[in-house]
């Protein structure tokens, strides 16, 4: 699924260099750490705050400090968050993404669990936050593997609205192993309907 593309270093390899810093909000899905360290990138763990009701929130000041202190190049955002299940509100994402934009940090948004939500907060794709204001700085991913129990397909959708970033990604992926089934391309009109 989405993690396959990150773990296989497609996006990490296409958009960062060895020793670059990648930020994650912790606790976090272990493959994010592994994929970065396997690619000789450093993970910058920014701990989320947990209250007495086990709800998680972000310390935005700590997030921005970590980004500037470590010269972070990439932020891996997971919505709903894995493993805590937090569904990010548009306001929360707006705050995170504005910090990333201010410091030139690219965002990968893993949205693989978008259909598996409990609670009252609706899923909002990172691509639609602030009426799509951040879309040129976001790479969104999802997969059929969670919602439809199709993990054996090793399939993922990657949506890259920014043409320059899409070109960079397409150039990189020609140098990594893949099967034709894992690279189903979406036509331009269909892709536009997602954002």
Where are these predicted regions, by residue range?
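Single conserved hydrophobic/aromatic residue that forms the stacking wall/gate
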Residues: 1, 6, 184-195
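Phosphate-binding glycine-rich loop
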Residues: 2-3, 7-21
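A short helix->loop->beta-strand "cap" motif at the edges of active sites that frequently abuts
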Residues: 41, 102-105, 135-136
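Active-site phosphate-binding strand-loop segment of PLP-dependent enzymes
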Residues: 50-121
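Structural signature of PLP-dependent enzymes
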Residues: 166-176, 180, 191-193
